[in-house]
Amino acid sequence: MREIKFQTYWIAGHDMLYDTNNDLEFRDKENHWITDLSDAINQPERYKVRQYTGLKDKNGVEIYEGDIDQEENGDKSVIVFLLKAGTYCVMPMDIYLNNDYQNESFFPDFIYGFGYDLFFDNCTPDKYLNIIGNIYENPDLLGGAS
């Protein structure tokens, strides 16, 4: 069974809050905090919640939804939870930025074009993924789609 963990990005403070004690109380380095996960979930205009995938990249970095992966050739992807497939996926940056990838009509074309290799169920993140940041703390990385 995978470990269930979350991170919460505080939009106004431009800071990631961590659940360091596994008590679902989230704090940052300056001790800003929220008391539980429901505070963040119920205020999406103030907080963005990221769930741990249960996997690590090739450098041992924990992989969360919203993380950015960079391949050796420089191509970037974003880790997303694809609702239609019920799994985490490595979404190519250009598709992440330019398409409604959660839309049901998009899904068949996505599978036809990329196959199932991008699904975590069918790849080995610990061998191939290289997490270089995330969409909240490193928005500058989103502009480098190739």
Residues covered by each model-derived region:
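Secondary-structure transition motif
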Residues: 1-146
